[in-house]
Amino acid sequence: MSVEKTNQSWGGRFSEPVDAFVARFTASVDFDKRLYRHDIMGSIAHATMLAKVGVLSDAERDAIVDGLQQIQAEIEAGSFDWRVDLEDVHMNIEARLTDRIGVTGKKLHTGRSRNDQVATDIRLWLRDEIDTILAEITRLQEGLLGLAEAEADTIMPGFTHLQTAQPVTFGHHLLAWFEMLGRDYERLVDCRKRVNRMPLGSAALAGTTYPIQREITCQLLGFDAVGGNSLDGVSDRDFAIEFCAAASLAMMHLSRFSEELVLWTSAQFQFIDLPDRFCTGSSIMPQKKNPDVPELVRGKSGRVFGALTGLLTLMKGQPLAYNKDNQEDKEPLFDAADTLRDSLRAFADMVPAIRPRREIMREAARRGFSTATDLADYLVRKGLPFRDCHEIVGHAVKYGVDSGKDLAEMSLDELRRFSEQIDADVFDVLTLEGSVNARDHIGGTAPNQVRAAVARGRKLLAQR
C-alpha cells in the first residue's frame, strides 16, 4: 500500500492532504513565530535532559543544540523561510533542524508533545514580558516621584464629581498615581510566580513513558517549580488570564490618568502643558495641539479589557485536556502585553516632561470655595457640632456665590454674620497654604508629607 507523504508531523494516519484553505485557516505560524526564541530555548533544555537520561547521545545533543542555535541566527537575520504548510513555530523550527542535521533532528521531539511545548513557550515568553513591564512601571514611578518632589508646594484644586472640593498639592495628586502603579506592580509580581511553573514533560496529556527528569529542564529554564499534573499543565491558561486581569487594572489606571491629562491640557483647564513631541496637530485647524498620547492610551485600554474577556470566553467551555481552541490564546495575550508595555513606555517618557502652570492651578483652587471644609473644622474646634458647622458654612458659601466673593475674600464682619464664634484667626485656615499645611499626617497633602512620601517611594523602588 502506498502512502502519500505530507509535510505534517501527524500525516501518517490520513489518506488525503489537508484542504488548502483549512491549512491556512488552522495555521498559527503568522503570529506564534514570535515565540521562536523561547521555543528554541525549551528545545535546547529538552535535548540536554534527554542526553542526561540516555535517550540521546552526547553527539546527537550537540548536533541538535548547534543546529538550533544556527536556526535562531537565521531567524534573527531575517533569512528564515516561515512556511504556512508547517502550521506553527514548532514544526517550522523542527523541519529546518532536520534539513540541517538530518535524521537526528527528528529525535528532538522524543518524550514531548506540542501541547506541553507550546505551554512552555508561552510561559517563558510571558515571564520575560512581565519583567519588561515591571521595569517600565518602575521607570514611570520614578518619573512621578521626581515631579511630585518638584511640585510638593504647588497648590491645585482637588476634585470630587469633577467639582472643586478641597485644595491639594500637585505633588500629592501625582503620588496617588504612584500608589496605584505600585499595586499594579505587586499584582504582576504575584502573577509571575504562577507563570513560572513548568509544564514541559506533561507531553500530550498523560506524561511520557520515557525516563525523563523534569527537574533538569526546570532548572535549565529557570522555572520555580515543575507542574504537578500533566492534564493541568497542557490545558489551562489561567496564568494568561491572570496576566490580562492584572494588565487590565494597570491600563484602567493609565486610562484614568490619561483622562486627567487630557482635561488639564484643555483651554478650559490649562493646568499643564505637554511638550510638542508628545502631541500632534490638526490637518484643518492650525491652532490645534492635541494630547494624542494620553488619548490613545485611554483608547487602547479597551484592547486589554477585550483580551481578558476573550480569554475567559475561550476557556470557559473546554473539557480537559488540550483543545484546538487554545490556539486562540496567543493573539489576545500578545496584544495585551504589547499594549501595556508600550503605554507604560509612553507615560514613563512623558510624565517627567509635564510642565505645570502653577498660577493657573492656584487660581482655580482659590475660586471654588475649596476651603469651606476648613471653615467648618474651625468652628468645630470652637465647640460647635459638625452638622451645625456644615449648615453655617453652607450659608456663607451661598452668600459668597451671590456676592462673587470667596470665603477668604470676605471681611471678618461678613463672616461673623453666620457665626459669632468666628474670630480674626479664621483667616489662617482660609488660605490655601493653611488648608494644605493643616493636613499634616501620613497620606495627607501637606508639602512635608509629600516629601516624606517621595522619600518612602524612592526607598521602595531601591529595594526592587
Swiss-Prot record:
Q: What is this protein called?
A: Argininosuccinate lyase
Alphabetical keyword list: Amino-acid biosynthesis, Arginine biosynthesis, Cytoplasm, Lyase
- Look up the record and give one Gene Ontology term from the biological process aspect: arginine biosynthetic process via ornithine
Cellular location(s)? Cytoplasm
Q: Molecular function (GO) terms listed?
A: argininosuccinate lyase activity
InterPro entries xrefs: Arg_succ_lyase_C, Argininosuccinate_lyase, Fumarase/histidase_N, Fumarate_lyase_CS, Fumarate_lyase_fam, Fumarate_lyase_N, L-Aspartase-like
Catalyzed reactions per annotation: 2-(N(omega)-L-arginino)succinate = fumarate + L-arginine
What EC designation does it have?
Answer: 4.3.2.1
Q: Which PANTHER family match?
A: ARGININOSUCCINATE LYASE
Q: Per the record's keyword annotation, is Cytoplasm included, yes or no? A: yes
Has keyword Lyase? Answer: yes
Q: To which pathway does this protein belong?
A: Amino-acid biosynthesis; L-arginine biosynthesis; L-arginine from L-ornithine and carbamoyl phosphate: step 3/3
Query: According to its UniProt record, which protein family does this protein belong to?
Result: Belongs to the lyase 1 family. Argininosuccinate lyase subfamily.
